[in-house]
């Protein structure tokens, strides 16, 4: 059976949420971020402003640029609403970020109903959040991802098969292929490889020898629409966690606690959403030196008490010796159980 894979991507997610909160910002160039741009509105992108750019550089490109602070609590709340909506359709979902994910629809819809499903899906997202998303449907994750980028924003595109996929992308610049970033694109340009069709000139062994096994195989397979990656949904939950890498490292304890609070809220929401309990907690911290440390604690009983878990994790994070600025922070609940063993024991003895 041919797979039906969908990729959705919320349009300028953070910026669009801020416009929803303040409609006067509509059609104005704005970015969300403090020192670094995390999201730019489509009006700001007309000035070549993009994510990961310094806010100071963005202001040089657009002196009238509106800069708003990041409100992760609100963004995560809305992201959770979207996740809950999708999980009512199927559990075969891989959420790759707060604003995008892959959905395996193979067992959900008939092939002839792809377009109708996409239109209904986009409508449901709009009704729920007043936000728009771009959607792609393909025969694997690669084709779905590329399809979702074709008619952004608020568009959709469907690849029915490999032949259609190859025909569509052959004349596109090679950077359309996932994994071809700015640096690799420059390397390929120096080798006179500008377009997807240029890759077809070379056999697999040449590409592997020239660019390494991972890059070479990715180029060879991707231009042909070959991708065997599965949508990585969790069949059995053993742990629930989230981590974040910071473009600007966290410099002091107040910044660390601020980000910890945000990660804890998001991770705890996932614990509740999955209707499970935890009996161990873990904090992961990576410094700018790339030294990585984890600290864990086994709890005396399984629980999903928010206050209890927060206090235990707060103690744990404060036990770290701050060697350097923090580049990555992670929060995890482990030893997941479907029931509260302490409560079951109490009920049994009543």
Swiss-Prot record:
Entry keyword Nucleotidyltransferase: yes
Site feature Substrate discrimination, where: 14
Needed co-factor(s): Mg(2+)
GO-annotated biological processes: DNA-templated DNA replication; error-prone translesion synthesis; SOS response
Catalytic activity entry: DNA(n) + a 2'-deoxyribonucleoside 5'-triphosphate = DNA(n+1) + diphosphate
Stored SUPFAM superfamilies: DNA/RNA polymerases (SSF56672), Lesion bypass DNA polymerase (Y-family), little finger domain (SSF100879)
Record note on cofactor: Binds 2 magnesium ions per subunit.
Keyword line: Cytoplasm, DNA damage, DNA repair, DNA replication, DNA-binding, DNA-directed DNA polymerase, Magnesium, Metal-binding, Mutator protein, Nucleotidyltransferase, Transferase
SS bond list: none
Active site: 100
MF term (GO), any: damaged DNA binding
InterPro entries, per database record: DNA/RNA_pol_sf (IPR043502), DNA_pol_Y-fam_lit_finger_sf (IPR036775), DNA_pol_Y-fam_little_finger (IPR017961), DNA_polymerase-Y (IPR050116), DNApol_IV (IPR022880), Rev_trsase/Diguanyl_cyclase (IPR043128), UmuC (IPR001126)
Protein name: DNA polymerase IV
Species this chain originates from: Fusobacterium nucleatum subsp. nucleatum (strain ATCC 25586 / DSM 15643 / BCRC 10681 / CIP 101130 / JCM 8532 / KCTC 2640 / LMG 13131 / VPI 4355)
Phylogenetic classification of the source organism: Bacteria, Fusobacteriati, Fusobacteriota, Fusobacteriia, Fusobacteriales
Name of the encoding gene: dinB
